[in-house]
Amino acid sequence: MARPIANPIISELRERIQHLEGAAARATAVLPFGIPGIDERLPGGGLAYGAIHEFAGGGTGAIDGAAAALFAAGVAARTTGVVVWCLARPDLFAPALAGAGLHPDRVIYVEAVREEHVLEACEEALRFGGLGAVVAEAVRLPMVVSRRLQLAAEGSGTLGLIIRRWRRQTEAADFGHPTASASRWRISVLPSQPLPVPGVGRARWLAELIRIKAGDSADFIVEACDGQGRLRISSDAADGSYQTRRSVHSG
């Protein structure tokens, strides 16, 4: 069988495309967590700017949902500039966001009646550019809409954070559907570590990196965001004792 003759024009075009894609990849800025164990699992060493990232609670309850919102707020807090937060449910507790490092003076809240309008406002804010981050709360994120948001983020270089919120159990199944997001996280509340004195320790979360472009999934046991939006690896997660207990109880 005769071998196909290479077309020099097509070969040159391929080389140019590969060169441009490589340059774009190298120029992509990231927002690191500042924790080597997490950053080394993320392409480029952090969450990519110019992309959208999804966050959801590990269950359908309000506690895990609040943890996901605070996790995203901590990410937004570590950016520079104004943060636009789009929502349809007026139940956001601003002091809690401040506790995660996102001061109210930095946030512009956009409240819409319908979820479709929330996502439209998110897209407009992403296209605007010059913002630290754009956050949107949504139950569903259709592929077509996620692509529009991703293209808007790519065009401006802004960080897009989508918090998936469920009102009922059946809605949580939508989180398994594919989207154009660069990463997908699931956050669950864990018991805080015992203190040597009576009291409640720093909140802890199980942060599951379910999906990441050009990377592998991973689980992290972290202590909740501090006043600067920074996480910290839990001490028993670092020495493996928590994973040991999980294995024993799940066996």
Language-model regions, residue ranges each:
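Detector for small/aliphatic-rich hydrophobic stretches
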Residues: 1-85, 99, 104, 211-215, ...
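Generic structural hydrophobic/aromatic packing signal, biased to beta-strands
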Residues: 38, 55, 72, 122, ...
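Solvent-exposed alpha-helices and their adjacent loops that cap or buttress functional pockets
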Residues: 47-48, 126-128, 154, 177, ...
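Conserved beta-strand scaffold positions in the cores of enzyme catalytic domains, especially
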Residues: 52-54, 109, 184
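Conserved nucleotide-cofactor-binding alpha/beta core module
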Residues: 80-132, 136-147, 151-156, 165
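Phosphate-binding/switch region of NTP-binding enzymes
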Residues: 167-236
